[in-house]
């Protein structure tokens, strides 16, 4: 799939998710874009919302988080603290362009999408918590841009509906990311085999949005067919933000990108034909040799013929055919047996 100038058929698309790791500082956001590029990310992703496009400013129990990393926090207050302000977007997109890194965002409501459209992003992402909103999904599909959907809390029925909407809107560029909506995610809760299931069941491009510690999961995901990897990125571990607990710093992210590139390189093309290196090593395969001196007219037997390394003699498949045949010439111990040596 083509996302901007990037082709996911050729390389795994690595996304640095900035999210709240700007810690309320535009300067930190801009520095993070430059650092993400240096760390090897193909794209920087931000989030486009206001607390009012996310939730209601209510103190009722429904709007208070229970458990987890943000226990007892009010939803409105959380989103007010974590947002990437609208007024930053122009500088963020401009900086990304200047640094040569792709930039796109997750809008969370119609007004966010309308605002984001002025920057003509290369793609959109739909968070799993918004993926059940069919009207919003259709608005995104109508944009005819590559769209990434996190599947975290989304049901199979909802995922089928998303596919149906994109088909109706004639937008074929859909990517599902396996995602576990726990922050952070325990490695045993990842269910990475779901990547394979998403590909087989929905026939879409697949990847991983990862909230676990470290980067074991992204590397494994590549081996399972992921063509997109999204991971939260932060400048350094001293940053205090809503997402810092499950984010990679510069050194960790760079190490992850290196590991992902090694993993995709190790996968190869899947063909079973021997490559040039393997063909060279065929010299050490077994073949038939004289294990004793053999006189002309003497019969070949288990006593004077052996299948050994290297491979300059007859293929071992001729062993049974050779037994009982007569030597056409004197053969010395250690000679490779050839087609004309028996009759």
PLM region descriptions:
Residues 1-343:
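Catalytic cores and adjacent flexible loops of soluble metabolic enzymes
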